[in-house]
């Protein structure tokens, strides 16, 4: 009607759209001359009558005259609640446990390389940063830089041993067998090491480690020396704390529905573990072998005390660092994340349903 009658009003909250022809319904006489003046034909009056009857409660407004109906869509959550993450985790565990061997080893190699690329960025960014902003802030910036590795793993798609410790949730939920979990861990761990060593050799032969007047090389040596000089118990407990945070980063990334949410969810826990000085087995597959290669260079021997170089060996790497850190990583991921959240959200409880209302436990 709006396009048919120049005198159509905008809207009436009670009657909807009303034209001047309807004045007759309210005992306001409208003579034929007035109707002709406004261009109201008999056909138009039929349409107006329908609207008029609606206005006085005697009819239903025609569909074409009805006011627009507005609907409010349900808000879309920017992330899944914890119970949904737990279900997603079990589904991911099932998928990972059945990944074909060729794809599994390639994705594992890529993950080792990605974590090592994050380690390269960490070394370059922090080689002399503490001189300008202090140790604490340098650790934080280094942690944010290192998070590149897990971002590439999660968004790019790869198989990381420490993240795959979460497969334990699938085992607890009886969707994955223990044999499948151990098989996945073995091959992923092995080829994470291969991927890390690949980046070690590429970075070494690139010569970039000689940059900044040897400051980068010194940083590499200091990191490797610190890691190989840890006691067994120190390395073990730092490994637990590290993978607790790493698996939380993976857990949060699973909740995110867009790339930005996933990236932010990864960066903060990873920055925390790096800044605190916790130990990550796959990252150490880059840091210490890189130190072993660099320590034999004339540059390193001219810059670093011989006593510091002597402690960086394959033996100290495996015994003092990699073995205890790996065991700690497994406990941190399996016990404190996979088992903890499975118990909270998925463990069957007779006559009760635990925390499945979409809210976390505070």
Q: What are these language model-derived features?
A:
Residues 62-362:
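Alpha-helical transmembrane segments and their helix-helix packing motifs
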Residues 1-64:
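Cysteine-centered metal-binding/redox modules
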């Amino acid at each position: 009607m709006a396009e048919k009658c120049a005198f159509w009003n905008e809207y009436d909250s009670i009657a909807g759209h009303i034209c001047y022809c309807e004045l007759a319904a309210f005992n306001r006489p409208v003579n034929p001359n007035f109707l002709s003046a406004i261009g109201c034909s008999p056909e138009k009056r039929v349409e107006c009558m329908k609207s008029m009857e609606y206005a006085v409660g005697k009819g239903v407004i025609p569909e074409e005259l009805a006011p627009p109906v507005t609907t409010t869509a349900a808000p879309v959550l920017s992330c899944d609640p914890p119970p949904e993450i737990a279900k997603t985790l079990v589904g991911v565990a099932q998928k990972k446990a059945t990944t074909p061997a060729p794809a599994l080893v390639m994705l594992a190699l890529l993950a080792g390389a990605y974590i090592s690329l994050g380690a390269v960025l960490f070394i370059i960014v922090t080689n002399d940063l503490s001189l300008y902003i202090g140790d604490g802030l340098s650790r934080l910036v280094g942690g944010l830089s290192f998070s590149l590795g897990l971002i590439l793993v999660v968004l790019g798609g790869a198989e990381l041993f420490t993240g795959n410790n979460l497969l334990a949730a699938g085992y607890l939920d009886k969707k994955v067998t223990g044999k499948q979990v151990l098989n996945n861990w073995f091959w992923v761990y092995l080829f994470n090491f291969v991927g890390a060593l690949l980046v070690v050799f590429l970075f070494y032969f690139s010569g970039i480690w000689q940059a900044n007047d040897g400051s980068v090389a010194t940083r590499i040596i200091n990191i490797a020396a610190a890691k190989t000089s840890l006691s067994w118990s120190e390395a073990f407990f730092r490994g637990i704390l590290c993978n607790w945070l790493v698996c939380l980063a993976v857990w949060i990334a699973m909740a995110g529905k867009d790339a930005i949410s996933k990236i932010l969810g990864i960066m903060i826990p990873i920055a925390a573990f790096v800044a605190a000085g916790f130990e990550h087995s796959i990252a150490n597959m880059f840091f210490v072998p890189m130190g072993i290669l660099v320590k034999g260079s004339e540059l390193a021997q001219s810059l670093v005390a011989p006593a510091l170089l002597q402690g960086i060996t394959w033996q100290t790497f495996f015994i003092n660092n990699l073995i205890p850190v790996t065991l700690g990583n497994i406990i941190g991921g399996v016990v404190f994340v996979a088992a903890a959240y499975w118990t909270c959200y998925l463990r069957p409880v007779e006559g009760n349903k635990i925390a499945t209302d979409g809210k976390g436990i505070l």
